[in-house]
Design a protein with these regions (language model features):
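Structural/interface elements that position substrates and couple domains in central-metabolism enzymes
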Residues: 1-170
Length: 170
């Protein structure tokens, strides 16, 4: 996506679905894989799905590091959405539980917004500063990451978000 922002610079964006989270998908795929192994009949496609779902989170972290110039240290990152899917406060196996600690552990200042995930997120994601709205989270941020597809985020004015950021990277 290349959006015009003040100064004519485009917004740098990477579009990739993070992975499938929640408690059911990982539990069910692991159970299927275990059943196959117990019966000496591995289900390689299911085992591959499990591996890919985990690898996608790692690749996302690598892409975010690249967008930050090789390090999260000293960067401010706005994270929109921490629940595993919209319209819930459920964070079981959410991508944010892998990605946000990598940001914080790498020295980033993380500002997060989630319409329903703040209460759980405060316990599960230490070191995160919680904001009430995406525009406040994005102000002077070096990077903005959307981890959950809340309808509230679909309606955001991306040009307004980008123009408030230190560097327009989404």
């Amino acid at each position: 996506i290349g959006l015009p922002v003040k100064g004519g610079e485009p917004v740098e964006a990477a579009a990739e679905r993070v992975c499938r989270g929640g408690s059911c998908f990982p539990k069910d795929t692991k159970a299927l894989a275990r059943i196959g192994q117990e019966h000496a009949s591995p289900i390689s496609i299911v085992e591959t799905v499990i591996k890919v779902n985990e690898d996608v989170k790692r690749r996302m972290i690598d892409k975010l590091v690249d967008l930050c110039g090789g390090s999260f240290n000293g960067k401010t990152v706005a994270v929109l959405g921490v629940t595993f899917k919209p319209n819930t406060d459920d964070m079981r196996d959410a991508p944010s539980l892998t990605i946000v600690p990598a940001l914080v552990g790498g020295g980033a200042k993380v500002r997060a917004v989630d319409p329903q995930g703040k209460r759980e997120g405060e316990h599960l994601l230490p070191g995160v500063h919680w904001e009430d709205d995406p525009y406040t989270a994005a102000k002077d941020a070096d990077l903005l990451v959307i981890l959950t597809e809340w309808n509230e985020f679909r309606a955001l004015d991306l040009s307004k978000l980008a123009s408030s950021m230190a560097t327009a990277r989404m």
